Amino acid sequence: LSRLPILINDHPMTSMDRVRSSARLLKSKNRCDMVIVDYLQLCDMRSDQKNRNREQEVAQASRKAKLLAKELDIPVLLLSQLNRASDGSIDHRPTLSNLRESGAIEQDADMVMLLCRPALYGKTVDKKSTYPTDGLGIVIIAKHRNGKTGEVYFHHNQSMTKLVDYIPPLEWLTRNAK
């Protein structure tokens, strides 16, 4: 990993304008194939327009990210917070409506992926897949402008902070074989 050409800008309160400027400079030197923003709501969103609310500011930042992707012809991955509404649902699976502070994120994005770990909510079996939840993680592809939506399961090894393909335990496979 240390040999990969990854550049990290950890300047506090970086704005999308600063991200764009850095990405354009790096792209001009053929050193920018992707931009990742971790996370959108931490970006500096101060603007000259005084009467903007937080939702409008997040919408503008989301739009700037979309324009950056088009301008430089690279993927821009925006990480975003979710609101806590999914905590109240039966299976705790997040949905597009849980994107925090802006429907514009959903509108601008070509793809929206949401993460879920049922064991964090005390579940022992995932209601939808019926898989045991110990180490189970779910990537919910909630929007895909050019493809299918659905779910992808992975195993999360917390002690190593490692993600691998999910393979149900042998007992589950034996019990559910038909």
Describe each region flagged by the PLM.
Residues 79-81:
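Conserved H-loop
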Residues 44-51:
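Conserved ATPase-coupling elements of RecA-like P-loop NTPase cores
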